[in-house]
Amino acid sequence: MTTPPQPRKATVFHDVRPFGGPARELVAVDGLLVDEVPPGAVVERVDGGGRLALPTLVDAHIHPDKTSWGEPWHSRRPAHGIAEYVAGDVELARALPSPVAERALRLMSHAAAQGTRAMRAHADVAPAFGLSGIEGVAEAAGTLAGIVDVELVAFPQHGVVRTPGVAELLAEAAASGLVTHIGGIDPAGFDTTGDRDGDQLGTVFALAEKHGLGLDIHLHDRGEQGLAPLRDIAARTSALGLQGRVSVAHAFAVAGLSARELDETADLLAEAGISLTTVALSETTILPFRRLAERGVRVGLGSDGVRDSWSPFGDADMLHRAWLAAWALDARLDEELEACFRLAADGGAELLGLPRADLRAGSPADFMLVDGECLPQVVVDRPRRDLVVRAGRVVARDGRLV
């Protein structure tokens, strides 16, 4: 006896205003938006109440393993330089009552409820932690499967060559099957060899090539100390055929370039297929993402650390991060405010290799409903996410997962 085929399911979101336009319906089938309900489909209807429909967002750079989100308040000590901040990471990790998996899940769930559909998460790999950070974030990501997509970076925050044992742990992480990327950090300024021989970039590029992983390297150094490693990364990327699989985070040296130097550097990065991420710290550190995009460089926006030993601030809300980008750039015009939202929505999606959630037929049914008149106003007001939809399924209401 043949079992009759099950009817398709369609969810119709009624009375929504994509990007603040006229009210209409959005129809989701099999995780995608479609023009109309298929014949014979079983229909579920959701009332949008005239709210704006906007794409959900992508956090291209976040550190969930370090967070104290939801934990007792932690008073921070003065710190100067990466080495002292790193020592603070170890101190905080030992002081927090909850393991990485619980803290990361708490933060990542909050991010998803605020409209984050995907993230690239960095987790520290060092003798002080072993692989516990990676394992904890991977566990949290598994719990949230189908709600938020997670790429995971094995990040050598303590340095690859300055801290014995890190290179071996990175190799273990690369072979674990848990990570999608290998990280790196300031090979010229922080992770210097001193009296030890070592080549951080050589180590991480070799691991990425061997295991078929991507690379995501932190570069905080400014001036030539930051630009020289950037050129080295571009050269290694091209030589190994890793175009499209390498990202550089922060890249503060790029933020301070003249127009001519910026275009030259952008062309170098575009040719090597290297992406950048920015975290909108200030007007002197945020990357000129619109000009970089014009020259062919993909740029994503990220939360960075959230309430960790480095800073008491951060909330993993990417709409807030778009607001911070607009504030750092002194955005006034509607098009400038919209560009900051697009950075959070489309920039990160392109960096992670995801299709844009642009609310058109054929695009992922990933969107959020908010009160507001228009997109620029939403960036400024940061209204509550009344409804968050992932693959056509309501996953959060009123800022909380359902």
Regions found by a protein language model. Give the residues of each.
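Active-site gating loops and adjacent loop-to-helix segments of metal-dependent hydrolytic enzymes
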Residues: T67-V100, P229-S247, T265, A316-R332
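Alpha-helical scaffold segments that flank or form the walls of functional sites
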Residues: G70-H122, A128-T143, A171-A175
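Divalent metal-coordination and catalytic microenvironments
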Residues: V16, G31, G50, H61, ...
